[in-house]
């Protein structure tokens, strides 16, 4: 559970990032695919080249889901329930991939917002993304 101070850190940092949802989401996915090529197997139907419309569109979906999570700190399970079902039952995404993508998002945020990406903001954002990953993998059990 995030503390009030951590929620403020996440809300502040994500407030700056959410206006760039498509760009940041695409960049995080591109980093994921380059750093962890096995993750591409879930996207064999897409053009995964840098800046492709597919990557940008999916990046926006991912970032929009994070925006939803930021808006529902107290009911993340409910807010992300459909997404959790989709990834667990239909897409069958390996749960470790959520952690890998979370790391890529941290890199993107640090790159674009170095002044705001303080040690406390980093820790809060990491905790938040870990919570999102836990929610998304909750239906796997």
Curated annotation (Swiss-Prot):
Keyword ATP-binding: no
Cellular-component GO terms for this entry: blood microparticle; haptoglobin-hemoglobin complex; hemoglobin complex
Domain of life: Eukaryota
Presence of keyword Transcription regulation: no
GO biological process assignments: hydrogen peroxide catabolic process
Database matches in InterPro entries: Globin, Globin-like_sf, Globin/Proto, Hemoglobin_a-typ, Hemoglobin_oxygen_transport, Hemoglobin_pi
Any one GO MF annotation of this record: organic acid binding
SUPFAM superfamilies, per the entry: Globin-like
Expression sites (tissue/organ): Red blood cells.
Keywords: Heme, Iron, Metal-binding, Oxygen transport, Transport
PROSITE patterns in the cross-refs: GLOBIN
Residues annotated as binding heme b: 87
Residue span(s) of domain Globin: 1-141
UniProt: O2 binding residues: 58
Further comment: This alpha chain is the A variant from the minor hemoglobin II. Its sequence differs from those of the alpha-1 chain variants A and B at nine positions each.
Function: Involved in oxygen transport from the lung to the various peripheral tissues.
Subunit structure: Heterotetramer of two alpha chains and two beta chains.
Similarity comment: Belongs to the globin family.
Protein name: Hemoglobin subunit alpha-2
């Amino acid at each position: 559970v995030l503390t009030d101070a951590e929620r403020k850190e996440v809300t502040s940092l994500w407030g700056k990032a959410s206006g760039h949802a498509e760009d940041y989401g695409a960049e995080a996915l591109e980093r994921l695919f380059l750093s962890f090529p096995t993750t591409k197997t879930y996207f064999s139907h897409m053009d995964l080249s840098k800046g492709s419309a597919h990557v940008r569109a999916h990046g926006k979906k991912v970032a929009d889901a994070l925006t939803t999570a930021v808006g529902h700190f107290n009911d993340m399970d409910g807010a992300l329930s459909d997404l959790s079902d989709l990834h667990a039952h239909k897409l069958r995404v390996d749960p470790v991939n959520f952690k890998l993508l979370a790391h890529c998002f941290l890199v993107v945020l640090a790159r674009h917002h170095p002044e705001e990406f303080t040690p406390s903001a980093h820790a809060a954002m990491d905790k938040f993304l870990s919570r999102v990953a836990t929610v998304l993998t909750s239906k796997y059990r």
